């Protein structure tokens, strides 16, 4: 099916589904419609396991939004559909770059829509149905609608012709829905990937493809041996500092008695924030030292051991915070904030696990970002599939 056919079908679907209809249910149906249409328009050789998984999650997310109609379910539908579309078109593009592609296409619509040759394919012989539709329906209908509104301002009786009729037709609503449908159809089916994005994709591989130069230090004022030693000393000192913090942190959480619920709430959130900030900084430090050569440096064994110990200690810190949050929930009930604490702590723990794998398997820093992208997507799906407010 040609691109402009897909756009017109999308416009028609938006008008039919959303004209004076309930948004949540019909948006779910629209999501299922786009998922199936994307599946049928994707080449069979590109329907790999990831694509099929995204197809299933798109269907489930659409059902979830039709049932719950909340913001998280809408986000899940939006992300799932565009991931499905991008994956079926550019499967070798790293998922982290899908965000950049989407943002560029969302805001470049006005510039690209006037490049008609990009999205409207002329028929080779004779007149196609789309050509006939544009000639006899779309263009005349557009002019009639514009002048209808012009004349409506000059005569109340003329304006009430449709308003007072049994058809109860609202042309303005149809036009707005058509514009929205065209915008959605255009950015969904006619998205472009710039050349610089393909160049960025080369730098986001999970594995090192070139021979890494171990003799090139990060800073000019430090040689490679000094940098290795500084990393070991830094991580060793941080391990000692973190060990002391873990002991004091757990003592304050599990042995000190809090006088009021408000005080306990404030202390819990402050400690969780400290844990999350500690995890982020820990991962950044490890990414700095293991960005290139030290992944393959035989002399960096002690540095790797120190980094793994630091990851384990940070993991212990996360587990302590999870246990304390569970205790807090059992005493004062479940709220969205406390569920949010679980979400952030879970993501922090997943980040530590992937950081450990990165060091163990000698992966690039991009490996961590690629995996965390899918982990974040999985978190959105979990949040959208369950009615947490009803628990």
Regions found by a protein language model. Give the residues of each.
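Juxtamembrane membrane-water interface segments of multi-pass membrane proteins
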Residues: 1-3, 44-47, 116-131, 160, ...
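Transmembrane-helix bundle segments that line or gate the permeation/cavity pathway
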Residues: 15-156, 177-201
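Membrane-helix interface motif
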Residues: 146-161, 244-259, 319-327, 390-391
């Amino acid at each position: 099916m040609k691109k402009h056919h897909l756009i017109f079908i999308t416009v028609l679907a938006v008008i039919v589904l959303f004209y004076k209809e309930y948004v949540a249910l019909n948006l779910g149906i629209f999501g299922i419609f786009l998922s199936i249409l994307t599946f049928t328009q994707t080449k069979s050789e590109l329907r790999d396991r990831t694509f099929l998984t995204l197809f299933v999650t798109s269907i489930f997310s659409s059902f979830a939004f039709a049932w719950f109609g909340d913001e998280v379910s809408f986000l899940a539908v939006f992300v799932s559909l565009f991931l499905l579309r991008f994956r079926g078109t550019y499967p070798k593009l790293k998922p982290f770059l899908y965000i950049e592609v989407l943002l560029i296409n969302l805001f470049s619509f006005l510039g690209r829509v006037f490049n008609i040759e990009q999205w409207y394919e002329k028929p080779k012989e004779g007149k196609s149905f789309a050509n006939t539709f544009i000639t006899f329906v779309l263009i005349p209908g557009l002019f009639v609608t514009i002048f209808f509104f012009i004349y409506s301002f000059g005569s109340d009786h003329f304006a009430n012709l449709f308003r007072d009729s049994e058809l109860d037709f609202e042309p303005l609503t149809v036009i707005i829905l058509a514009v929205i449908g065209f915008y959605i159809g255009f950015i969904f089916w006619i998205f472009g990937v710039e050349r610089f994005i393909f160049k960025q994709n080369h730098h986001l591989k999970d594995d090192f493809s070139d021979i890494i130069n171990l003799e090139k230090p990060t800073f000019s004022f430090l040689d490679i041996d000094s940098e290795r030693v500084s990393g070991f000393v830094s991580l060793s000192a941080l391990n000692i500092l973190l060990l002391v913090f873990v002991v004091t942190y757990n003592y304050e959480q599990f042995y000190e008695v809090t006088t009021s619920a408000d005080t306990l709430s404030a202390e819990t959130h402050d400690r969780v924030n400290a844990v999350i900030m500690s995890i982020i900084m820990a991962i950044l430090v490890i990414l700095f030292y293991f960005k290139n050569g030290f992944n393959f440096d035989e002399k960096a064994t002690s540095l790797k051991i120190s980094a793994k110990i630091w990851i384990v200690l940070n993991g212990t810190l996360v587990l302590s915070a999870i246990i304390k949050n569970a205790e807090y929930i059992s005493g004062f009930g479940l709220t969205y904030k406390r569920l949010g604490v679980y979400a952030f702590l879970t993501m922090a723990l997943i980040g530590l696990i992937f950081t450990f794998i990165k060091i163990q398997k000698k992966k690039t820093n991009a490996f961590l970002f690629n995996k965390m992208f899918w982990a974040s997507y999985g978190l959105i799906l979990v949040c959208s599939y369950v009615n947490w407010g009803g628990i």
